């Protein structure tokens, strides 16, 4: 099962969710909707080519990721508890220099991390891609 789906499943069941390592480690979370907009800008661009980093210019900490999952997926009357485990291995961290992408391709992301999670929840509920990703039942523990 995909790690995110495990975390989401725990949140939906109001089960505790562990944060391993340094909860302030952060990474960029580029949403596919923003990425598609960037590809469209590349196709429409009059530039002859180039190398561009894809990023959103802001990072989401591990703590923000977990709290976002809880906010969107946990029952409002019984949200999952966050359990901090600083002794466990740290997650990877990343950030990209994206100023050139923003400037030359006239692009900036418009979707937040919570937008991504809300859309993901909607797709889980409506299952438009069940044939490709499976159904809710495929992700039960």
Please place each PLM-identified region on the residue numbering:
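Flexible, glycine-rich beta-alpha linker
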Residues: 1-3
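C-terminal substrate-binding subdomain of Rossmann-fold SDR/epimerase-dehydratase oxidoreductases
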Residues: 11-141
């Amino acid at each position: 099962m995909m790690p995110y789906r495990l975390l989401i499943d725990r949140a939906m069941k109001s089960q505790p969710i562990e944060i391993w390592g340094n909860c302030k480690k952060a990474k960029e979370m580029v949403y596919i909707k923003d990425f598609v907009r960037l590809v469209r800008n590349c196709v429409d661009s009059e530039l002859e080519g180039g190398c561009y980093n894809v990023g959103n210019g802001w990072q989401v900490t591990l703590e923000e990721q977990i709290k976002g999952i809880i906010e969107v997926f946990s029952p409002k009357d019984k949200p999952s508890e966050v359990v901090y485990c600083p002794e466990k291995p740290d997650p990877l961290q990343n950030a990209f220099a994206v100023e050139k992408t923003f400037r030359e391709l006239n692009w900036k992301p418009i979707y937040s991390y919570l937008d991504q999670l809300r859309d993901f929840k909607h797709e889980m509920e409506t299952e438009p891609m069940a044939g490709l990703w499976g159904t809710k039942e495929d992700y039960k523990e």
